[in-house]
Amino acid sequence: MAKTALKVKAARKPKFGVRAYTRCQRCGRPHSVYRKFGLCRICLREMAHAGQLPGVTKSSW
């Protein structure tokens, strides 16, 4: 889990645009965040399996 200070820091608009980065809205993880959902891969998988993301289904082929 991310510290509260890091979540607040990421929410602020940086002085330079290239310093902006995404964090998971649920757990605060800074890596592998899907922009479309605003969630990291781990939270996305958990919520999809629980059926909390409408329209998201497990793919199979």
From Swiss-Prot:
Keyword RNA-binding found:
yes
Which is one Gene Ontology cellular component term of this protein? Answer: cytoplasm
Q: Cofactor comment in the record?
A: Binds 1 zinc ion per subunit.
Under the heading InterPro entries, the entry gives: Ribosomal_uS14, Ribosomal_uS14_bact, Ribosomal_uS14_CS, Ribosomal_uS14_sf
The entry's Zn(2+)-binding residues are 24, 27, 40, 43
Biological processes annotated in GO: translation
Required cofactor(s): Zn(2+)
Which UniProt keywords are present, listed alphabetically? Metal-binding, Ribonucleoprotein, Ribosomal protein, RNA-binding, rRNA-binding, Zinc
- GO terms assigned for molecular function: rRNA binding; structural constituent of ribosome; zinc ion binding
Q: Which Pfam families match?
A: Ribosomal_S14
Name the Gene3D superfamilies on file.
30s Ribosomal Protein S14, Chain N (4.10.830.10)
Q: Which family does it belong to?
A: Belongs to the universal ribosomal protein uS14 family. Zinc-binding uS14 subfamily.
PANTHER family under this entry?
30S RIBOSOMAL PROTEIN S14, SMALL RIBOSOMAL SUBUNIT PROTEIN US14M
Which NCBIfam families does the entry link to?
Answer: PRK08061.1
Q: How does it assemble?
A: Part of the 30S ribosomal subunit. Contacts proteins S3 and S10.
Please describe what this protein does: Binds 16S rRNA, required for the assembly of 30S particles and may also be responsible for determining the conformation of the 16S rRNA at the A site.
Protein name in UniProt: Small ribosomal subunit protein uS14B
The species this protein was found in = Cutibacterium acnes (strain DSM 16379 / KPA171202)
